[in-house]
Amino acid sequence: MAEEKKEETMEEPRIGVYVCHCGVNIGGVVDIEAVRDYAAKLPNVVVSKDYKYYCSDPGQLEIQKDIKELGLNRVVVAACSPRLHEPTFRRCVEEAGLNQFLFEFANLREQDSWVHMDDPEGATEKAKDLVRMAVAKARLLEPLEASKVSVDDKALVIGGGVAGIQTALDLADMGFKTYMVEKRPSISGRMGQLDKTFPTLDCSMCILAPKMVDVGKHDNIELITYAEVKEVDGYIGNFKVKIEKKPRYIDEDLCTGCGSCVEVCPIEMPNYFDEGIGMTKAVYIPFPQAVPLCATIDKDYCIECMLCDEICERGAVKHDQEPEEIEIEVGTIIVATGYDAYDPTEKLEYGYGRHTNVITGLELERMINASGPTDGKVIKPSDGEKPKRVAFIHCVGSRDEQIGKPYCSRVCCMYIMKNAQLIKDKMPDTEVTLYYMDIRAFGKGFEEFYKRSQEKYGIKFIRGRPAEILENPDLTLTVRSEDTLLGKVTEYDYDMVVLGVGLVPPEGSEKLRQTIGLSKSADGFLMEAHPKLRPVDTLTDGVYLAGVAQGPKDIPDAVAQASGAAARAAIPMVKGEVEIEPIVAVTDSDVCGGCEVCIELCPFGAISIEEGHANVNVALCKGCGTCVAACPSGAMDQQHFRTEQIMAQIEAALNEQAK
């Protein structure tokens, strides 16, 4: 049990310094004993010790014992990165009755021993500098208290693909009211377009549709389709969200999905669900298993002949329907916006969009699907005949620095082999060739799937990225490539070429990212707070990531991450409140002139002007210090990193006499 905290700031600093060996990480390079003895001579240092692992229970107990017996009111631990163990040591000193913010970390591992392994003497001197600077700051530390904010027990899931569906179901099953916003007329995401899933070749819609139905019928889920998030204000526990629901021109409450309106509509248009290779009507139901099972009118094609209105017995057609603005308040947000397939038209050498029989992997998926535009038949777009020779090209839009996409999309190798196998199942006499750079069969059952492609199906693999695809007068295609295993240039003719396109962030993701205030990684996908320790969290508290929104992944990984995001989002909602760390910016209202420079620069929107001076919302502030550095009047300061504390560290670093 923690003892009652002391009134530390009015007392003379009594500092304890604890130098950690971190096994051989620090102790194998730095002379720990020399650093320990040096620290003991610094002003206000009462005790200086070393131990092999201070993060261990015995190490922490030693620190707590000294706090109680020696009356320490400041603690400095010289060890690894505060990103790893600062919470550990804060908790340690707090349990001994000391305010957790009267603790300072000196990083002797990442900032010293790991970067100076070849210079032990220099590393030891640098360790002394780092400890001296930490002690200088520790003298000026102030006790701080965390604040708490209440958390609304409702959640918002953005995106209706398999990741969004899993997240929403998990949260709803926990008892939380969950809003799901999907920009398309129906949920399903990309998984709904697939015929089979690798490596088990399960029917994609067979395993997805029951979950879609569960979403539509769940008492705790409010499904808002054909809609987009337009504004997000607030902070963890108290987000205010504005959603724009586009007009379907069909009343969802009245429509039964009977399809009568679709039958009588005289206007055809490209079917987006079939990737444009099939046609649908100007009034359409995206696919038979759609949730909600409701028609939508596309006004870009509708001629308002009113035949749909006349045939509808329930009067569900509403040609005068207007966009609807919906406002909700939620405690947490999960972003599961999925991906778009790379558009290969910029790869001019492959002729997509110019060569009739060059198609993408997703277009082939719709061909292979029994409910697709060709009723499951694989045909050449040029003449509708079955192809006798088919080539697949891997890594189109992936692992390609020339187009700014150096990352691996992680699913292309497997979905190409899956579709190659399905073609052989449908047309055993068809020759299938795969052009690849490397086969990345990393998942459970993937290597066996790869071997089956070679051994059972006799699919040919050529290692090399094709240089170009040429269209011949008879509309066959010549693929010119280097075979890197044979060390020669090859040219082979095919009836159809399928481009294995990679995954890219979906259209509109950048606008949504800015609306919510998230970061993105170099590949354009949304960035997690930490790739290993916080893979579903973001730097915006209360906002989480699921599925391909965070980066390319297959269906099992997307579902697993979705459940992880739901579990993380549930934590603050279960607790009903969250603790806000007090390392935030503060304003001296007597000095602030209300110039608003800080407002323009704050990346988290945490500052507003109230009564003529800046006011910081501590729930939004992340303590980045941007406003402090920019304030022209010096009115902004940051708790735990106050100007006088930083200056004390600088002076200690430059103090040659102390060295």
Swiss-Prot record:
One of its GO terms (molecular function) is metal ion binding. FAD binds at residues 159-182. [4Fe-4S] cluster 2 binds at C265, C302, C305, C308. Pathway: Cofactor metabolism; coenzyme M-coenzyme B heterodisulfide reduction; coenzyme B and coenzyme M from coenzyme M-coenzyme B heterodisulfide: step 1/1. Residues 245-275, 293-322, 582-611, 612-641 form the 4Fe-4S ferredoxin-type domain. [4Fe-4S] cluster 4 binds at C602, C621, C624, C627. The keyword Metal-binding applies. It catalyses: coenzyme B + coenzyme M + 2 reduced [2Fe-2S]-[ferredoxin] + 2 H(+) = coenzyme M-coenzyme B heterodisulfide + 2 H2 + 2 oxidized [2Fe-2S]-[ferredoxin]. Its EC number is 1.8.98.5. [4Fe-4S] cluster 1 binds at C255, C258, C261, C312. Its cofactor is [4Fe-4S] cluster; FAD. [4Fe-4S] cluster 3 binds at C592, C595, C598, C631. Keywords: 4Fe-4S, FAD, Flavoprotein, Iron, Iron-sulfur, Metal-binding, Methanogenesis, Oxidoreductase, Repeat. Pfam families: Fer4, Fer4_10. It is an enzyme of class 1 (oxidoreductase). Belongs to the HdrA family. The heterodisulfide reductase is composed of three subunits; HdrA, HdrB and HdrC. It forms a complex with the F420-non-reducing hydrogenase (Mvh), which provides the reducing equivalents to the heterodisulfide reductase. This is H(2):CoB-CoM heterodisulfide,ferredoxin reductase subunit A. The lineage of its organism: Archaea, Methanobacteriati, Methanobacteriota, Methanomada group, Methanobacteria. The gene is hdrA.
